[in-house]
Amino acid sequence: MLKSFCILSVFMVLFLAKFPDLCSGEEISPLKIVVRNSEYLNNPCNGVTCPSGYRCSIVDKQCIKKEK
């Protein structure tokens, strides 16, 4: 009985270490992924703000000069 409890405890610790969201008490939601994707689409240049006269290109993933 004690041996099986120890084995179960080890597996539970390994499981929680693999999925840290489960031990934080937060719900796992697919909306987090959507938020991350929308943040990426709003600024695909890895968080870099483009200088004045330039815009961030989704295709090139870099700042390019705005066309007039």
Swiss-Prot record:
Effect of substituting residue 61 to A: 2-fold decrease in potentiator activity
One Gene Ontology CC term in the entry: extracellular region
GO MF annotations in UniProt: ion channel regulator activity; toxin activity
Keywords, in A-Z order: Disulfide bond, Ion channel impairing toxin, Secreted, Signal, Toxin
Disulfide bonds: 45-56, 50-63
Subcellular location: Secreted
Propeptide residue intervals: 26-36
Coiled-coil portions: none
Tissue: Expressed by the venom gland.
Location, primary (coarse class): secreted
Region (Highly charged C-terminal region, binds to TRPV1 channel): 55-67
Signal peptide residue numbers: 1-25
Family named by the database record: Belongs to the scoloptoxin-04 family.
Protein name (record): Tau-scoloptoxin(04)-Ssm1b
